[in-house]
């Protein structure tokens, strides 16, 4: 069994209106590892950022991040603690 670690995952959406449904589907799929979620949008633009606190092993986090990154216009950055 792999050890779970705490991560902060930042998800940037270039056009949140177009990408929200696809991103939400991935977040729901991996919801068992998401501890907290905060979303903010850039006033005056369609950009948005979602910040997640995640408790997962490295393999699961990689799968999660890669699936989000495959959505056109979505960027993912991760910090491990």
Regions found by a protein language model. Give the residues of each.
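Long, contiguous binding/interaction regions
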Residues: 1-81
